[in-house]
Design a protein with these regions (language model features):
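Non-heme di-metal
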Residues: 5, 9-229
Length: 229
C-alpha cells in the first residue's frame, strides 16, 4: 500500500483505496489508476502548467490517434531519466560520493520509456513526417529539460510526475477505445511480448495495460523524488 523508497513515500494508486489516499492525492471516480497530486507551491503549478500545455497540443494534433500520439509522447518521456541519470552521474564523480541506486534507477526509467517507444513504433508504424517530429522533439525537449534539471531539479521531477499522470489517463482512454471496438484489439508486437514476458497470444490491450502500469510507477516515483527535494 504505502512503499518507503529511500526515505521517499510512494503512493501506489492501484493498491490504495480512496480513504487511504493522502489529502493532496485525488482519485478519479471513473478509474482507480487515475491519481492527481494537487500543486502545493508555485514550482508545482509551473510544472502542471507546462504539462497541461503540452497535453493540449497533443490532443489538438493527434485527437483519437492514440498509437501515433504515443509514439511522439514516448520519445519525449524517454528523455528525463537519461538527462537526470547523466547529471547525477557527473555529480557523483564531481563530489566523489556514491549516489546509491539513484543513477541506475533513472537510467532504467529511461530505458523502459525507450521500450515503450519501440513498441509503439511497431504498432503505429509512424510516417516519415512523424519520425521527423520524433527527432525534433528529442532535440528541443532534451535541451529544455537539461536546463530545467540543472537549475530547478524539483520542478523537473514534478513535471515528469505530471507527465506520467497524463500518460496514465491517455492509456486509460486508449483501453476504453479498444473495449468499445473503436480500435481493433490486434495481436501484440513481438518486441512487447519479449520485453514484458507476455503470452505469445497476447493482444494490444494487454500491452497497453502493462505500459500503463509502468507509467503509474514512474508517476509515483517522480512525485516522491520531487517531494524529497
Amino acid at each position: 500500500p504505502i512503499i518507503n523508497f529511500k526515505k521517499k513515500v510512494i503512493y501506489s494508486s492501484i493498491m490504495l483505496s480512496r480513504d487511504e489516499l493522502p489529502n493532496n492525492i485525488k482519485l478519479s471516480s471513473s478509474n482507480r489508476t487515475q491519481v492527481h497530486l494537487h500543486p502545493e507551491c508555485f514550482s508545482d503549478s509551473v510544472a502542471l502548467f507546462i504539462t497541461r500545455s503540452l497535453r493540449f497540443f497533443a490532443d489538438t494534433f493527434f485527437k483519437k490517434r492514440y498509437g501515433h500520439r504515443a509514439v511522439v509522447l514516448e520519445t519525449v518521456a524517454a528523455v528525463p531519466g537519461m538527462v537526470g541519470g547523466m547529471l547525477a552521474h557527473f555529480k557523483s564523480l564531481r563530489k566523489m560520493i556514491d549516489d546509491g541506486d539513484f543513477i541506475k534507477e533513472l537510467l532504467e526509467e529511461a530505458d523502459n520509456e525507450r521500450m515503450h517507444l519501440m513498441t509503439f513504433i511497431a504498432i503505429a508504424k509512424p510516417s516519415t513526417f512523424e519520425r521527423f517530429i520524433i527527432m525534433a522533439g528529442q532535440f528541443v525537449f532534451g535541451a529544455f529539460y537539461t536546463l530545467l534539471y540543472i537549475f530547478f531539479k524539483r520542478t523537473a521531477h514534478r513535471m515528469v510526475g505530471y507527465f506520467e499522470e497524463e500518460a496514465v489517463f491517455s492509456y486509460t482512454e486508449y483501453l476504453y477505445e479498444i473495449d468499445s471496438g473503436k480500435i481493433p484489439n490486434t495481436p501484440a508486437p513481438e518486441i512487447a511480448i519479449n520485453y514484458w514476458g507476455l503470452d505469445k497470444n497476447a493482444t494490444l490491450r494487454e500491452v497497453i495495460e502493462v505500459i500503463r502500469d509502468d507509467e503509474a510507477g514512474h508517476r509515483d516515483r517522480n512525485h516522491a523524488i520531487a517531494d524529497s527535494i
